[in-house]
Each structure stands twice: as C-alpha cells, then as structure tokens.
C-alpha cells in the first residue's frame, strides 16, 4: 500500500495551533463556530466548564440513558435498548461548544459549523434568564430538562426518527438518548443582555443523532448489541452504568462484519483494501472515532488513481457496488472543481473500461452502481483537479460488493 496511515488526535493538534482556525474547519464551513471570536455586543461575566461540571454532565446523561436502556422508563413505557452507549467526555466537542456559548445567542449553529473530523455533531441548548445575576450553575437541570421531553415522545420514532422540532418539541430528548452518540463536550457562558442576566448551556454530541429515518436505539436485551471492543455496565469497573456499552481509549466502536459480501473494505486492514496508486501519491488512511476512511487533497493540475488490486465477482446475475464518499473544495465557499470517477475493469481484458462519475457532496454520501455482469472485476478511483482552480479533496469509506441490484 502506497499511502500513509494517520491516527486522528485532533484535539492535541488544536492545542498546538492555539487560536488559529484549523484547515479542516475551514473546509467544513466559512463560518465554523470554533473560528468565531466571542460576541462583542454581549458582556460575558463567567464562562467555561469545570472538572466538577464535567462529572455532573456525564453522570446525568448516563443515568438517564441507563434508565432507558434497562427498561426503567416505566412512566412512559419505553422498551429496553440493546446498543445504548455510555457517554464519555470529548475535549474537541467541548471546545467548539464553548465557542458557541460565547456567541450569546440561543440558537443552534449550522450542522457544518460545528462538524469535526471524527464525526458529524449533534447539539442541545439550554437558556435561563433572570433580573439578578445567577449564583449557581445548573447542568443537572439542563440535562434533565432535555430528557423531560420524553413525556411528549412518540415511541414509534424509536425505529425511525422523523422529527424532533414539534410541536411538541422532543429533539433534545432524542439526542440525549441517541444510542450511538458516545462522546459529549459542553460549554457555558453567563452574560448580561440589557438589564437581563442570561445563562447559556451548549452540549455537542458525536456522532450526532436526530438523523431522519435512522434508528434512535435498537430494542432488545441491554448490552446485547454492544461494540466488540466495549464492556457492559458493572463488568467495566470504574464509573459505569447498567445497560450501557462503555468504550475505553480513543478507538472507534467495532461491530461484527455483516455477511454476504463478495468484497468489503472499511480501511481497517482488510485484505480487500490492498491498493496501488499512480499519479500524485498523496492518499492517506485516516483513523477516526467513527471509523476509518481514505482520502487525498490535490492541488490544481494534479491527478491520482487509487486501484484496488483484489478483483471481485459473484456466482451469477448482477452485482451491486456501494461506497460512501465526500468531495469538494479544501476551503468552504470556493468552487467545487474536482473530477472523481469510479472505473471498473476486467483483469482478462485490458481494453474493457466502464466508468461512472461521483457527484459533489460535502457529507459522506452513499453511492451505488449496479453492474450487469458477474465476472471478475477490478475497481479504480480516478481523481483530478483542473489547472486554474482551487485545491480539492476526496474521501471514501466502506466500499462493498454484493450479489444483486443496488
């Protein structure tokens, strides 16, 4: 393999960069929240989250998530969860959340404005107001207030999230108990707005929840759907909670691979991931807290081809080739000019060539193509950037082949 492997430790890099706006954040949004200065029109009196606050935030979230997972939310008859993760603290999410709280605005920032490389990010907000300065901090009240939306929650959404905006509003509750969210980081600012004191609480979650049609949690025996590299409840030792899957260390959750694929590469060392490159040899495998992907950044006038050396095929009929990718300009707002193509070849016939282009998408997008043959086939990805444009990126993950149509 002719590409570099990078373990993503974004927060350490951010600390080294100090107050600058990281390149990746510039890619996600022209107005990434981390890159904003505090709002100069409001007078911030206190800000930040203490170590004691962190303990309260984690305790309150996990106590409530455990209540759902173990079937103890009997008042509203919620079923048990088999895959509810235990939340742990994330400094990068907290850093971005604090920058949001420093804006003194009780409104969500845009999804791209809070994204980090490890995952897409969800968000919950809480605001309290008073004519007098607050003398206490109410993280427990904020978290429990989000959870209290359970009273209006429609259980049918557990198997397919539809909408949390309401009325009545339930999106804070669904994000707080979204099973696959397992990292959280929060920020707080108390400020004066005219004659009113305001206290703004922001929590960011990764991977983010409230995805339309996605499962909020899987119904079943608690912990029966935990990641392979996690432990469950009291068996974990330390601070743990009944019915919650607990991760340790900075590694992505791993699950048993699904069966029935003729080819699958998730860029985690599988034999199907063997590749060669031609042109610009800049492909890098990035390991994040939500899995691995391969990516490249090309300057204007450059091109590169990534070729998978393991051919694939099925016994008869057609086959479906699926992949997830995202591509666009290295700086948000610049013109998207990268040309990406998936090329399919026949090892026995070098003259055979079938290609299909990849459209623009700044979020990972599922792409499937049905091949109307079953003979051995190879896959290459060709990426190029025309001269006179701006640098462009392409990232791909989870490439698979199965029998039948897409």
From Swiss-Prot:
GO cellular component, one term: extracellular region
Cell compartment(s), UniProt: Secreted
Tissue-level expression: Expressed by the venom gland.
Signal peptide positions on this chain: 1-18
Gene3D superfamilies xref list: CAP
Protein name according to UniProt: CRISP/Allergen/PR-1
Disulfide bond entries: none
Post-translational modification: Contains 9 disulfide bonds.
Family membership: Belongs to the CRISP family.
SUPFAM superfamilies to which the protein is assigned, alphabetical: PR-1-like
Classification via Pfam families: CAP (PF00188)
Annotated SCP domain residues: 58-205
Nucleus as UniProt keyword: no
Glycan attachment residues as annotated in the record: 39
Keyword list, A-Z: Disulfide bond, Glycoprotein, Secreted, Signal
Membrane spanning stretches: none
Highest taxon, organism lineage: Eukaryota
């Amino acid at each position: 393999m002719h590409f570099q492997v990078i373990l993503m430790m974004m927060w350490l890099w951010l600390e080294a960069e100090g107050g600058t706006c990281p390149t990746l954040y510039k890619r996600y949004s022209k107005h990434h929240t981390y890159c904003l200065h505090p709002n100069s029109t409001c007078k911030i009196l206190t800000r930040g989250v203490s170590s004691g606050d962190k303990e309260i935030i984690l305790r309150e979230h996990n106590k409530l998530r455990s209540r759902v997972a173990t079937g103890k939310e009997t008042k509203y008859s919620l079923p048990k969860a088999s895959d509810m993760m235990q939340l742990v603290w994330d400094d990068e999410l907290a850093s971005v959340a604090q920058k949001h709280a420093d804006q003194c605005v009780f409104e969500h920032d845009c999804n791209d404005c809070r994204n980090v490389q490890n995952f897409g990010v969800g968000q919950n907000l809480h605001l309290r107001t008073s004519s007098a300065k607050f003398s206490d901090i109410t993280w427990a009240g904020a978290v429990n207030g989000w959870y209290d939306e359970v009273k209006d929650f429609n259980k049918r959404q557990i198997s397919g999230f539809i909408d949390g905006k309401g009325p009545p509003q339930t999106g804070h509750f669904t994000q707080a108990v979204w099973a696959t969210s397992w990292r959280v980081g929060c920020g707080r600012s108390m400020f004066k707005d005219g004659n009113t004191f305001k206290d703004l609480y922001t929590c960011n979650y990764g991977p983010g929840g409230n995805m339309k049609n996605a499962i909020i949690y899987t119904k079943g025996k608690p912990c029966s759907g935990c990641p392979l590299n996690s432990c469950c409840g009291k068996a974990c030792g330390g601070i743990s909670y009944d019915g919650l899957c607990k991760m340790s260390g900075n590694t992505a959750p791993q699950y048993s691979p699904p069966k029935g694929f003729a080819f699958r590469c998730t860029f985690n060392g599988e034999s199907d991931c063997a590749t060669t490159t031609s042109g610009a040899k800049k492909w890098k495998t990035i390991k994040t807290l939500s899995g691995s992907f391969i990516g490249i950044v090309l300057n204007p006038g450059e091109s590169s081809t990534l070729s998978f050396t393991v051919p694939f095929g099925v016994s008869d009929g057609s086959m479906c080739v699926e992949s997830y990718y995202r591509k666009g300009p290295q700086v948000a707002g610049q013109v998207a000019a990268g040309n990406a193509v998936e090329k399919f070849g026949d090892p026995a016939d070098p003259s055979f060539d079938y290609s299909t282009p990849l459209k623009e998408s700044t979020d990972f997008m599922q792409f499937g193509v049905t091949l109307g043959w079953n003979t051995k086939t190879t896959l290459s990805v060709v990426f190029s950037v025309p001269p006179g444009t701006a640098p462009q990126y392409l990232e791909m993950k989870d490439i698979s082949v199965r029998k039948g149509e897409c």
